[in-house]
From Swiss-Prot:
Lineage, top ranks: Bacteria, Pseudomonadati, Pseudomonadota, Betaproteobacteria, Burkholderiales
Protein name as it appears in the record: 3-hydroxyacyl-[acyl-carrier-protein] dehydratase FabZ
Enzyme class: lyase
UniProt organism field: Polynucleobacter necessarius subsp. necessarius (strain STIR1)
Disulfide bond sites: none
UniProt GO cellular component terms: cytoplasm; membrane
Amino acid sequence: MSTPIAIDINKILKLLPHRYPFLLVDRVLEISPRESITALKNVTMNEPFFQGHFPGFPMMPGVLIIEALAQTAALLTFSDERAEDAIYYFAGIDGARFKKPVLPGDQLIMTAKLERDRAGIYKFAVQATADGEIAAEANITCAVRTKGA
């Protein structure tokens, strides 16, 4: 087992192609390459999606929680470096469950565990928590391909 390391926002910006408002990972707290990752997203009232989801009771959309988890998984895949022409596709989801709303002011803690890696196809068990409670969990499949291929 390797020594866990952290990744700051500057390295995240080098590893992921996403940018505001779609970059949904603020920091990697711990990563054990090829094994698991724990990251966080500070959810603020300034998030653009809160304007319409939902007026009077803002909550983070479940699909964006899943996207944040997929970005977290991508960081596990690209923890060393990402080839300039590599793109990370979200390919599938199984068993998604949403158990707690994520609200402004929450700190979303996201974990991804690599379950399988075969021919550029990755399977992960992912989970997001807020205030120590499970907000969402799923099994996701992602693929790394060359842009335009």
